[in-house]
């Protein structure tokens, strides 16, 4: 029966992947019907906290986008990339990493990918190199963002173990960023000469490759103000979450918990942007970040609920099987999280499904934090939206998905970045805890 239940979970996930987009969440609901109504499993916990945090953060980001703030950030990113075009392989992941770090969602990378592709092409660099690292960096940065649902959940799970919110960020930010930079350095050592790519030459001969110059940017009246308001909102979240942590204790017995506070601050941020940037609030519903964020909520609802249902119904079996393995080989947790996130399609959903089980197995905080970056393996299956966008935006053909599905340019940078980040985590975490 256990094997059949696993097959049901995998079948639901693969059906969702095949249908694409929001259907990953839909298929999770189908899997729940089979597991609960068909096989008699008790429904697991719905990740309401994760979903509401994503909704709140996306509401603020979408308001900033409508105000022109996101375009302003992309303009700054383009200026940076064009100021040092020869270093595009290093600057591309820097841009997407920090945009995700600030926004709490990797969907902000959509806006920068066309710029990265253009600058790389103009420099004769295979766009696949900076694009692949940039996409991976935008996924890994989720595990270091102060306002991402994954980090907020992880912080809450670790607090009873004596690890504060600020400690978690102090470990995750440098280890993941350095991991991405080392990966960029390694990838830059390989052949990045676009002119020697046979597919590129073929596409040039057919007139399928176009060079575009720098786009003209005109800032909306409230663009800079919306960015400032959003940054102040993030700082407020970090300050409050730090102040209520047991390690700092500036606020004793807080009335509002961390999750609720983030929702309050982000919705307030959206309100202030709407008031002072004078945006059309109806336009928020059509913003690309709002649509992708709400899609993410449905996906998290479906796959995280499905995953938690399976795990919670077999937690004792999992403890018995995995306890001894993790005790002797703690790094195996990172591998488990890697493959789980590949299927669950969400950092927050993966953390929500497996971190409580790892804590129940008495996995130590160092291992938990060091392995956290491994929940970012969303690049393995070439169906994630930012990955597909990178493929579509590269008209040179260098960023392409092979016939065997897994042979695409995101695999090597992704595995390297996660592996290095996890290794650095095992070095840095014992020092800071």
UniProtKB/Swiss-Prot annotation:
One of its GO terms (molecular function) is C4-dicarboxylate transmembrane transporter activity. Pfam families: DcuA_DcuB. Keywords: Cell inner membrane, Cell membrane, Membrane, Transmembrane, Transmembrane helix, Transport. It is found in: Cell inner membrane. The chain crosses the membrane at residues 19-39, 50-70, 90-110, 133-153, 166-186, 225-245, 261-281, 292-312, 320-340, 368-388, 411-431. It is a multi-pass membrane protein. GO terms for cellular component: plasma membrane. Belongs to the DcuA/DcuB transporter (TC 2.A.13.1) family. Responsible for the transport of C4-dicarboxylates. This is C4-dicarboxylate transporter DcuA.
């Amino acid at each position: 029966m256990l094997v059949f239940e696993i097959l049901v979970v995998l079948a639901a996930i693969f059906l969702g992947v095949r249908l694409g987009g929001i259907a990953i969440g839909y298929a999770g609901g189908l899997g729940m019907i089979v597991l609960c109504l068909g096989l008699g499993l008790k429904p697991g916990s719905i990740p309401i906290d994760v979903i509401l945090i994503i909704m709140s953060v996306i509401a603020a980001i979408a308001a900033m986008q409508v105000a022109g703030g996101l375009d302003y950030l992309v303009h700054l990113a383009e200026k940076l990339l064009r100021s040092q075009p020869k270093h595009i392989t290093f600057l591309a992941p820097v841009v997407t990493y920090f945009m995700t770090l600030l926004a709490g969602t990797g969907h902000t990378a959509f806006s920068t990918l066309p710029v990265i592709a253009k600058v790389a092409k103009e420099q004769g660099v295979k766009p696949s190199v900076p694009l692949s690292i940039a996409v991976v960096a935008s996924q890994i940065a989720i595990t270091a963002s102060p306002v991402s649902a994954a980090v907020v959940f992880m912080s809450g799970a670790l607090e009873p173990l004596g690890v504060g919110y600020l400690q978690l960020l102090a470990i995750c930010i440098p280890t993941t960023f350095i991991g991405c930079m080392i990966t960029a350095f390694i990838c830059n050592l390989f052949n990045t000469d676009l002119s020697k790519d046979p597919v590129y030459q073929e596409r040039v001969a057919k007139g399928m490759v176009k060079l575009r110059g720098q786009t003209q940017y005109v800032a909306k009246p409230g663009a800079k103000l919306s960015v400032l308001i959003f940054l102040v909102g993030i700082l407020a979240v970090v300050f409050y979450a730090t102040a209520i942590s047991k390690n700092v204790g500036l606020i004793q017995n807080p009335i509002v918990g961390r999750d609720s506070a983030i929702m309050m601050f982000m919705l307030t941020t959206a309100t202030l942007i709407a008031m002072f940037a004078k945006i059309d609030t109806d336009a928020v519903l059509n913003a690309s970040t709002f649509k992708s964020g709400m899609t993410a909520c449905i996906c998290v609802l479906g796959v995280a609920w499905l995953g938690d249902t399976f795990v919670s119904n077999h937690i004792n079996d999992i403890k018995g099987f995995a306890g001894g393995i993790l005790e002797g080989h703690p790094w195996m947790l990172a591998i488990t999280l890697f493959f789980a996130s590949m299927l669950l399609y969400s950092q927050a959903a993966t953390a929500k499904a497996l971190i409580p089980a790892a804590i129940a197995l008495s996995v130590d905080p160092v291992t938990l934090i060091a392995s956290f970056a491994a929940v970012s393996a969303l690049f393995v299956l070439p169906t994630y939206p930012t990955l597909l966008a990178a493929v579509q935006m590269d008209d040179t053909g260098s960023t392409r998905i092979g016939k065997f599905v897994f042979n695409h340019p995101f695999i090597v940078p992704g595995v390297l970045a996660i592996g290095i980040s996890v290794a650095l985590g095992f070095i840095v975490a014992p020092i800071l805890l």
